[in-house]
Swiss-Prot record:
Name listed for the protein in its UniProt record: Fusaric acid resistance protein FusD
Repressor in keyword set: no
Cross-referenced InterPro entries: PHBA_efflux_AaeB/fusaric-R (IPR006726)
Bilayer-crossing regions: 7-29
Keywords: Cell membrane, Membrane, Transmembrane, Transmembrane helix
Membrane topology (UniProt): Single-pass membrane protein
Protein's organism: Burkholderia cepacia
Primary localisation category: membrane
Length: 208
C-alpha cells in the first residue's frame, strides 16, 4: 500500500514538474509542430510513393489538430489552418505529379534525363527546400523552378504528337505544376509573406 502511494505521489510530482517546466503552450513546442507539419510537404516530394497519400494526409491532419489545440488561446492560432491548407494543397499536388511521372511509358522522350524531367526534379527539390526552411530566397527559387518546369513541359507537349492517353497524362502533369504555382502565389497562404514581388495592397485612407 505504501509503495503504491509513493509511486502515485512520484507520478503526480513528475506530472506537475513537467507541466511547469515544459508547458504545452510553450512557443518552442508550437514551432516544432509547425516544422513537423511543413515536413509533411517535404515527405510528399521525396518519400516512398506506396501508401504515401494516406500517410501524408493522416500525418498532416494529426499535426494540425495538435497545433490548433496548443494555439487555441494564442493570437497566432490563425496560422494553423493557413499552414494546413498550404501543406495539403502543395503536398497533394506533388504526390499527384509523382504518380503521373511514375506511370509514364518507357520512351526516350519521357526519360528522367530529358530537360523537362530534369526541370521538374529541380522544382521538386526547390519546393522541398522551401517547406523545410521557408525564406524569401527559397520562395523565389521555387517559383522560378515551377515556371521553368511549366515551360519545359509545355514545350515537350508541342514538340511531338503523343498518343491520346500520353497527351492526357502530360496535360495532367502540366495541370499539377500549375496547381503548385497557384498555391505558392495564393495571397492567403503563409508563404505569401515571402513573395517579394507580390502586389502591395493599398492601406485604408491612403491617398490615390
Amino acid at each position: 500500500m505504501n509503495d503504491a502511494l509513493a509511486l502515485l505521489l512520484s507520478m503526480l510530482v513528475s506530472a506537475i514538474a513537467f507541466a511547469v517546466l515544459f508547458p504545452p503552450t510553450a512557443p518552442w513546442l508550437k514551432k516544432r509542430l509547425f516544422a513537423d507539419l511543413r515536413h509533411q510537404a517535404v515527405a510528399a516530394c521525396h518519400a516512398r510513393l506506396a501508401g504515401l497519400r494516406t500517410r501524408f494526409e493522416s500525418g498532416a491532419r494529426d499535426l494540425m489538430y495538435q497545433a490548433h489545440t496548443l494555439s487555441a488561446d494564442h493570437p497566432t492560432c490563425s496560422a494553423t489552418p493557413c499552414w494546413m491548407f498550404a501543406v495539403l494543397e502543395t503536398g497533394n499536388a506533388a504526390i499527384d505529379l509523382r504518380h503521373e511521372l511514375a506511370t509514364l511509358p518507357s520512351d526516350p522522350r519521357y526519360a528522367p534525363t530529358t530537360p523537362w524531367r530534369r526541370a521538374i526534379e529541380t522544382m521538386r527539390a526547390a519546393l522541398s527546400s522551401l517547406f523545410a526552411r521557408p525564406d524569401a530566397e527559397r520562395f523565389d527559387a521555387t517559383l522560378a523552378a515551377v515556371n521553368d518546369a511549366i515551360d519545359a513541359t509545355r514545350q515537350t507537349l508541342d514538340a511531338f504528337t503523343p498518343t491520346r492517353e500520353e497527351r492526357h497524362r502530360l496535360q495532367r502533369i502540366l495541370s499539377h505544376l500549375h496547381f503548385v504555382r497557384t498555391a505558392l502565389l495564393d495571397p492567403e497562404s503563409p508563404l505569401a509573406a515571402l513573395n517579394r514581388n507580390r502586389p502591395v495592397r493599398p492601406q485604408p485612407g491612403a491617398s490615390s
